Amino acid sequence: MQVSQYLYQNAQSIWGDCISHPFVQGIGRGTLERDKFRFYIIQDYLFLLEYAKVFALGVVKACDEAVMREFSNAIQDILNNEMSIHNHYIRELQITQKELQNACPTLANKSYTSYMLAEGFKGSIKEVAAAVLSCGWSYLVIAQNLSQIPNALEHAFYGHWIKGYSSKEFQACVNWNINLLDSLTLASSKQEIEKLKEIFITTSEYEYLFWDMAYQS
């Protein structure tokens, strides 16, 4: 079994909790209060800036030019493509640049990004790849799940979010991360794989806490 599938199987419980969370279901059914989503967009904007820094560690830790380029491209994708989803809602919700500049990450947000950065700093390229994977992969799974709800993709407000995270372009980015981790772990020991599982499950749990933080706002 490939390492990515092992991690995926072990994350099913917490990912199921994420999918069924009222914040996520509110996006899919178009019933989520806009003020909660507005708070989420601001916090996720701050998150993405730190998330990109974890990918930057991939450039530092990479042992060959090809992987360095791939991580560099991933940073560009976060700041240009994924951030475009946020910029759409920043305009829609009339969030000002001053608001973004003055916003502070919540404890859950800061703890999540600090954990990823810490694991990336002290680990190898494998730990970096594992640390960033659950965010993108779980978002893809969530968006694909929500896209099956009747009329969710056509929703005037939340449809853009679901389309963005269930798109072929976003799926390609996630697949790159999955394939990279699998290629890096072909000769990994059981102990090394269990450490990667710990990182993957912990970041998945942080994903749940992030949804809950936004819902409780």
UniProtKB/Swiss-Prot annotation:
GO terms for molecular function: thiaminase activity. It holds the Pfam family TENA_THI-4. Homotetramer. Belongs to the TenA family. The keyword Hydrolase applies. SUPFAM superfamilies: Heme oxygenase-like (SSF48613). H.pylori is expected to possess a reduced thiamine biosynthetic pathway. Some enzymes involved in de novo thiamine biosynthesis in other organisms, such as ThiO, ThiS and ThiG, are missing in this species. The very acidic environment of the stomach makes the accumulation of formylaminopyrimidine very unlikely because it is mainly a base-degraded derivative of thiamine; formylaminopyrimidine is the precursor identified in a thiamine salvage pathway in Bacillus species. Pathway: Cofactor biosynthesis; thiamine diphosphate biosynthesis. Gene3D superfamilies: Heme oxygenase-like (1.20.910.10). Keywords: Hydrolase, Thiamine biosynthesis. It catalyses: 4-amino-5-aminomethyl-2-methylpyrimidine + H2O = 4-amino-5-hydroxymethyl-2-methylpyrimidine + NH4(+). NCBIfam families: salvage_TenA (TIGR04306). Catalyzes an amino-pyrimidine hydrolysis reaction at the C5' of the pyrimidine moiety of thiamine compounds to give a hydroxymethylpyrimidine (HMP). Displays low activity on 4-amino-5-aminomethyl-2-methylpyrimidine as substrate, indicating that the enzyme may act on a different HMP precursor that may derive from the human stomach food assumption or processing. Is probably involved in thiamine biosynthesis. Does not display thiaminase II activity, as it is unable to hydrolyze thiamine. The active site is at 135 (nucleophile), 207 (proton donor). Its EC number is 3.5.99.2. GO terms for biological process: thiamine biosynthetic process; thiamine diphosphate biosynthetic process. PANTHER family: BIFUNCTIONAL TH2 PROTEIN, SI:CH1073-67J19.1-RELATED. The lineage of its organism: Bacteria, Pseudomonadati, Campylobacterota, Epsilonproteobacteria, Campylobacterales. GO terms for cellular component: cytosol. The gene is tenA. This is Aminopyrimidine aminohydrolase. Substrate binds at residues 44, 139, 165. The keyword Chloroplast does not apply. Activity is lost at pH 6.
